[in-house]
């Protein structure tokens, strides 16, 4: 009887995934842990390894098709895999009748402690990235009990093993549920007739676009947005960057205006901490965050990604510049990990890089504010009673009106303007 390999749970809260690429076909001989396919959900592509050795009998799900966790995606002739059979029909019936049991922590096997005897003959179900992670942490993966579906070991299980306890539930959003590399396979347009006066083609909505759409709709439906628009003379900022641009280049740093904006935003979040919170209406709680992680919205060929500069308050402008540039390269190359897109407390969206000016950026929920920066343009301003030309930066600040009042939002905007108008004040921030 063929081993029916079902789509495993590829992350917390993830119930389906799009098969973006198969690495095997019928008749191929495979070994345990060989990569079978790439499966995408939200913004992450996960490599799915084979839990058994054998010969591929039949690929059940075509590329570009969305499969639900538990669906049979490939059949493998693996005579020695009977003990590893997922008990497919039993699993299906139990999951349909009692779906809540699938994720109940009480049903999971306890995590082994480092003092317990290890069965070296035990078959381990874990992705290659998890095995590598365990090796890097000096953990014998055979000693770790898996909390994933069908006993699959996750990175959280490895961390829990190191801590000597059970895995803790993640409080991150489902959009950042895995720590695999980010990638995207563009959806191919469907072959249709282009005859007639109004030719059309259709394509399946890519998984990343679905995730972006879901996040945008959720944010707009959940948070009442208010957007303030302003502008500021940044001649001093322009001169400051010009002065230190060559010094930065000598250290291998490409200095842009964005790190200055990051530091100014962090200062505003500290002065007006309501902007650095989350508003949990269901729980009746406001979450105050005592760390300052700044998301940087990045436009890529695969869609909008938001890598995060963590602990931006502890980093210099040069360090922030280096990190932003590194994250931008990873975003363009599809190499961002989900961990690099987790944990933002406030986000910056730079429409100025596309030549834009003012706009109404959508809050990256569950954050409560987002700062939009437009282009720097030469404009006439009044200085010392005279009209002169100066570089002027457009700013747009959207905030969740449930948590932030208009005056608070404008005061935060004024603080950001003050710092960008005189960047030497950023040195006073420590």
Swiss-Prot record:
Residue spans of biased composition, Basic and acidic residues class: 84-104
Catalytic activity: N(6)-[(R)-dihydrolipoyl]-L-lysyl-[protein] + acetyl-CoA = N(6)-[(R)-S(8)-acetyldihydrolipoyl]-L-lysyl-[protein] + CoA
Cofactor note: Binds 1 lipoyl cofactor covalently.
GO cellular component: cytoplasm
Domain of life (superkingdom): Bacteria
Pfam family membership, one: Biotin_lipoyl
PROSITE patterns: BIOTINYL_LIPOYL, LIPOYL, PSBD
Alphabetized Gene3D superfamilies for the sequence: 2.40.50.100, Chloramphenicol acetyltransferase-like domain (3.30.559.10), E3-binding domain (4.10.320.10)
SUPFAM superfamilies: CoA-dependent acyltransferases, Peripheral subunit-binding domain of 2-oxo acid dehydrogenase complex, Single hybrid motif
UniProt GO MF annotations: dihydrolipoyllysine-residue acetyltransferase activity; lipoic acid binding
UniProt biased composition (Low complexity): 166-193
EC id: 2.3.1.12
Signal sequence region: none
Function: The pyruvate dehydrogenase complex catalyzes the overall conversion of pyruvate to acetyl-CoA and CO(2). It contains multiple copies of three enzymatic components: pyruvate dehydrogenase (E1), dihydrolipoamide acetyltransferase (E2) and lipoamide dehydrogenase (E3).
Oligomer status and interactors: Forms a 24-polypeptide structural core with octahedral symmetry.
Family note: Belongs to the 2-oxoacid dehydrogenase family.
Name this protein carries in UniProt: Dihydrolipoyllysine-residue acetyltransferase component of pyruvate dehydrogenase complex
């Amino acid at each position: 009887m063929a081993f029916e390999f079902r789509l495993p749970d590829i992350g917390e809260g993830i119930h389906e995934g799009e098969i973006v690429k198969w690495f095997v076909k019928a008749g191929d001989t495979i070994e345990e842990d060989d990569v079978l396919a790439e499966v995408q959900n939200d913004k992450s592509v996960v490599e799915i390894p084979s839990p058994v050795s054998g010969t591929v009998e039949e690929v059940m799900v075509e590329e570009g098709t969305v499969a639900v966790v538990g669906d049979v995606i490939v059949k493998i002739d693996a005579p020695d895999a009977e003990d590893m059979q997922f008990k497919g029909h039993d699993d299906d019936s139990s999951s349909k009748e009692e779906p809540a049991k699938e994720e109940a922590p009480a049903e999971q096997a306890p995590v082994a402690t480092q003092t317990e005897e290890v069965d070296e003959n035990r078959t381990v179900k874990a992705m290659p990235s998890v095995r590598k992670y365990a090796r890097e942490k000096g953990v014998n993966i055979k000693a770790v009990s898996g909390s994933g579906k069908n006993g699959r070991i996750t990175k959280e299980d490895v961390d829990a093993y190191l801590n000597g306890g059970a895995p803790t539930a993640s409080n991150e959003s489902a959009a950042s549920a895995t720590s695999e590399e980010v990638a995207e396979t563009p959806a191919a347009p469907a072959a249709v007739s282009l005859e007639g006066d109004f030719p059309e083609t259709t394509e399946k909505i890519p998984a990343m676009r679905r995730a972006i759409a879901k996040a945008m709709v959720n944010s707009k439906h959940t948070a009442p947005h208010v957007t303030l628009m302003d502008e500021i003379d940044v001649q001093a900022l322009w001169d400051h960057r010009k002065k230190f641009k060559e010094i930065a280049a000598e250290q291998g740093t490409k200095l842009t205006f964005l790190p200055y904006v990051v530091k100014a935003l962090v200062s505003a979040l500290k002065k007006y901490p309501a902007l650095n919170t989350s508003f949990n209406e269901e729980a009746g709680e406001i979450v105050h965050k005592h760390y300052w992680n700044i998301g940087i919205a990045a436009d890529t060929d695969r869609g909008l990604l938001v890598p995060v500069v963590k602990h931006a308050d502890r980093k210099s402008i040069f360090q922030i510049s280096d990190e932003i540039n590194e994250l931008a390269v990873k975003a363009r190359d599809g190499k961002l990990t989900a961990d690099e897109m987790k944990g933002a407390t406030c986000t910056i969206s730079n429409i100025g890089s596309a030549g834009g000016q003012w706009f109404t950026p959508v809050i990256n929920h569950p954050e409560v504010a987002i700062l939009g920066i437009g282009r720097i343009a030469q404009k006439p301003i009044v200085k010392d009673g005279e009209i002169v030309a100066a570089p002027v930066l457009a700013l747009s600040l959207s905030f969740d009106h449930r948590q932030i009042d208009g005056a608070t939002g404008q005061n935060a905007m004024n603080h950001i303007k003050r710092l960008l108008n005189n960047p030497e004040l950023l040195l006073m921030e420590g």
